[in-house]
Amino acid sequence: MPMIADGIGVPLENLRLVQNHAGGTFGYKFSPTNEALIGAAVKILERPVSLVFNQFQNITYTGKRSPAFMNIKLAADENGKLLALWGNNYVDHGPYSEFGDLLTMRLSQFTGAGYGINSIRNKSTTVFTNHAWGSAFRAYGSPQSYMGSEIAIDVLAAKMGIDPFDMREMNCYKESEGTTIPTGYPPEVYCEEALFKTARPLYEAAKKRVAEKNAASDGKIKYGIGVSLGVYGCGLDGVDTSNAFAELNPDGTVTMYAAWEDHGQGADMGVLVSSHETLRQAGIRPEQIKLVMNDTKTCPNAGPAGGSRSQVMSGNACRLAAENLVAAMKKEDGTFRTYDEMVAEGLETKYEGNWVTTFCADHPIDQDTAQGDPFATYMYTIFLPEVAVNTETGKVTVEKFTCVADVGTIMNRLLVEGNFYGGLVQGVGLALTEDFEDLNHDTTLKNCGIPYPKDAPDDIELHFNETYRPSGPYGAAGCGEAPLDAPHPAILNAIYNATGARITRVPARPERVLAALKELEK
């Protein structure tokens, strides 16, 4: 909102936004697109304005994930224990600076994340170009980071003759070793050892399936299993905050006011579940909870939907608002006041919940060294894709995708699973088909490589560990970014496992895979 207000010259308090249900936007609404244009037109014409983009405009007028060149080196002892990481990375952020500083920082926060690496020297540089403008996109900064470190650890494991799953497991975060995140502080919880324990039999079963398929193949189609580990933080860097209201109505229902932005991820269910878990103490049923959402006139500021912050930040705000209301309703004998009793006793019927991560102020991120403790909590995911590679055409198919994740207490399993199904399919597109380099070509959904339904594996297997997060509402972390932080290097690693050809650039379209296969013949 401040960007829009500044851009069209309107005081922030005079700007009202009412969000329509938008479906999946995956972060690009962090940057104003058509809203500011509409605002300028309204000011000039002094009448309601509608702006509809055609497909070409929708693709070219909106931001894209910033491409990056990741140059990563890893060192390990003779047993495979990681000792050091060195990096020199460059990000093409297009012509505008917005969020460029944050993107640069993300590469330092997530490159090598998930592993106990005591010595890290990782320099990242963001440059301006006349290419597509860079904006926020799901798992901001981590897909670039893990293209570096998750392929590098695979290369190192192969050189040392160590199974890539074993290499990752032996180096994961361990409380007994006091391992830290790349920014120098311990994670909120140590859950990776248990995550690898859950994933181990799934990985062994996948290796067996792949071996059986290769044994039965004539060699034209080769099969492989890949692995990667992704970690992503929940929240905006440093101190973050969100607010919500809970109001008891005359008919005994409760209205929740929340600006928990809905971008297809299920914000309405998030508000409902986060508030009902507390409101049910007063006998309030889910159908008695009304939602007023995403109108800046009636809802308090909840912050943006991004960085998987909403479940943690807005979920806590809804929880606190509900707790404050329930506390006011509760009588000394343990029963609860009605609306009429509240009014008769002069008690307020509307309460605010304000959640602030003040603890993040204790160790703010140093802009020069990237050291600090920026996030309330983290999400952890192990990716295990199984691929088939046609060695004559270079076509890669993801036949099965197994995913093992820990996103804390699961508040609504259907929504979490939906986030993971969608994110993994986006990862398939990122790894194999999607590109946006040629503005004379990549300006239709077909030409920019959006995957078809047939490109998505029918067999997606999800497993969740639920390690309680002390800073999350009822122990929950976020989940939105988790499935898209590192599925693509796992797919590229699976191509290597199948063929011995190492792909280090996305998308791994058939011509790129064929070129890598021909290199093996030299």
Q: Which residues are covered by each model-predicted region?
A:
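Conserved beta-alpha junction segments in alpha/beta enzyme cores
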Residues: M1-I8, M105, I225-W260, Q265
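Short acidic, glycine/serine/threonine-rich loops at helix termini
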Residues: M1-M3, F26-P32, T60-S66, N71, ...
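Thiamine diphosphate
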Residues: P2, G23-E46, S50-V52, A267, ...
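C-terminal catalytic domains of large/alpha subunits in multi-subunit enzymes
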Residues: G7-R16, K43-S50, E78, L103-I221, ...
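Cysteine-centered functional microenvironments
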Residues: V18-H21, Q55-Y61, V254-W260, P374, ...
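Active-site cavity-forming subdomains of large catalytic enzyme subunits
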Residues: P48, Q55-I120
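Generic structural signal for well-ordered beta-strand positions
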Residues: L83, T255, V396-E399
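Short, solvent-exposed aromatic-acidic interface loops
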Residues: G87-Y96, E261-H263, F401-G408, E466
